[in-house]
Amino acid sequence: SRGLGDVYKRQLVEPSDVLKCEAEALLSGIVLDTKNFTNRTGGRTFEAAAYLRRLGADTQDVQRMFQGDLNSMIARYDIIRQAELYRDDIAVVALDEECDRVTAAKAADELLTLKGIRASFVLYKKGDGVYMSARSLGEVNVQVILEALGGGGNSTTAGGQADNITVAEAKAKLLEAIDKYFEN
């Protein structure tokens, strides 16, 4: 998204040709990619956002794009409420019921806003297997941890699924993978 802002800034497209909704769509991509300018954010990111703002992007309209509904918030908090601390600074949630993938990912993100949490893992039942969503502030490489369970991603955002396994079995494997990660 920052790259698209650069395209406009380098005037490959005339500023007068950019619609407000286009500038807002690009700005919303930056907000999403950087998790509200807190992750992978540098000077070029802020420059692109400022440029899009000058093109007419309304930050309040962008914020409204990300508003959820009450039921979604309650679902996230129901997940967060079940979090257990592992190794003092890793939040782990193991749900025995099915869950929406987006809700699980948002809950994993939100767990990182709690003081002292360096990484979060949300495991939930899906059919005869388990889906996993993991987040980190960067100090813990969640990709490496989830690779041990067949997942992938990057150091701060990872996910995966394991078939023919219970949530309890997946949680045990996750805790083992976390221990192995910290032993190395």
Language-model regions, residue ranges each:
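Short, small-residue-biased leader/transition segments that mark boundaries at the very start
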Residues: 1-8
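Internal alpha/beta core interface subdomains
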Residues: 19-32
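Hydrophobic helix-and-loop "lid/oligomerization" segment in the mid-to-C-terminal part
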Residues: 32-148, 153-184
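Short, polar/flexible loop-turn hinges at active-site or ligand-entry regions and domain interfaces
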Residues: 12-17
